[in-house]
Swiss-Prot record:
Recorded domain comment: The presence of a 'disulfide through disulfide knot' structurally defines this protein as a knottin.
Processing after translation: Contains 4 disulfide bonds.
Record keywords, A-Z: Disulfide bond, Secreted, Signal, Toxin
GO molecular function, one term: toxin activity
Identification of the protein by name: Teratocyte protein CftICK-IV
Top-level taxon in the UniProt lineage: Eukaryota
GO terms under cellular component: extracellular region
InterPro entries in the record: Huwentoxin-1
Chief localisation class: secreted
Species: Cotesia flavipes
Other remarks on this protein: Negative results: does not influence host total hemocyte count. Does not reduce hemocyte encapsulation in the host. Has no effect on humoral immune system, since it does not influence the activities of prophenoloxidase and phenoloxidase in the hemolymph of larval Diatraea saccharalis. Non-toxic to human cells, Gram-positive or -negative bacteria. In vivo, ingestion of this peptide does not impact larval mortality of both lepidopteran species D.saccharalis and S.frugiperda, which are permissive and non-permissive hosts for C.flavipes, respectively.
SS bonds (residue pairs): none
Length: 82
C-alpha cells in the first residue's frame, strides 16, 4: 500500500513539474517569451495583441504572462488591431 501511495505522489509531482514546462515551450514556439506567470493554455499565449506605448510595438496582453520575443512595429499591424 505504501509503495502505491509513493508512486502516486511521485507521478503527481512529475505532472505538476512537466505541465508548465510544456506550456512555456508552446509559448516559445509561438514566438513568445514568458516574462512572468505562465500561459494557461497552449493556444492563449499569443492571442490578444495590444500596442505597447513605450516600445511602439505590438505586445501580447500581459494577463497571459507572455510577450513576443520579436515585437512587430504597431504600424505594420494597424489593420489587424484587436
Amino acid at each position: 500500500m505504501a509503495k502505491i501511495l509513493l508512486t502516486f505522489i511521485i507521478l503527481t509531482c512529475l505532472i505538476v513539474t512537466i505541465t508548465p514546462a510544456v506550456y512555456d515551450y508552446a509559448c516559445y514556439k509561438k514566438g513568445c517569451s514568458k516574462i512572468q506567470g505562465r500561459c494557461s493554455t497552449n493556444a492563449d499565449c499569443c492571442d490578444g495583441y495590444q500596442c505597447h506605448p513605450q516600445t511602439a510595438s505590438w505586445q501580447v496582453v500581459q494577463k497571459n504572462g507572455c510577450y513576443p520575443i520579436n515585437p512587430v512595429p504597431c504600424s505594420q499591424l494597424q489593420q489587424k488591431n484587436v
